[in-house]
Amino acid sequence: MGAHLTRRYLWDASVEPDPEKIPSFPPDLGFPERKERVMVATQQEMMDAQLTLQQRDYCAHYLIRLLKCKRDSFPNFLACKHEQHDWDYCEHLDYVKRMKEFERERRLLQRKKRRALKEARVAQGQGEGEVGPEVAL
């Protein structure tokens, strides 16, 4: 998990996104039909279930179901395996989506930097395939 943080300090930090901040590029950039993620559990449902702030994510509805199952079948803690699996799987998919978003942000920052360097070279008169006068014989 810490590999992206190591890359921030050892390599170019300008193209490494900050994991604490929201992405700087629009989510539909390159994906015109991309749907926005929506929360299934409402704020009131999460308050009623007394979920902590760390538990209020896109998988909160699965966690609410799991906690209700554990409460309803208290002595038998093995009765909620299916709900536990659903919640764990949702958390895994959420983690994978966040890592893909992080990687997408990193690649878009690299692309932005490459384009800025290319524009700077063109502005100096060194376009694609051109050689500067000091190099030419």
Swiss-Prot record:
A motif (Cx9C motif 2) lies at residues 80-90. The modification Phosphoserine is found at residue 73. It is a peripheral membrane protein. This is NADH dehydrogenase [ubiquinone] 1 beta subcomplex subunit 7. Disulfide bonds join 59-90, 69-80. Pfam families: NDUF_B7. One of its GO terms (cellular component) is respiratory chain complex I. Coiled coil: none annotated. Residues 56-98 form the CHCH domain. It comes from Mus musculus (Mouse). It is found in: Mitochondrion inner membrane; Mitochondrion intermembrane space. One of its GO terms (biological process) is proton motive force-driven mitochondrial ATP synthesis. InterPro entries: NDUB7. The gene is Ndufb7.
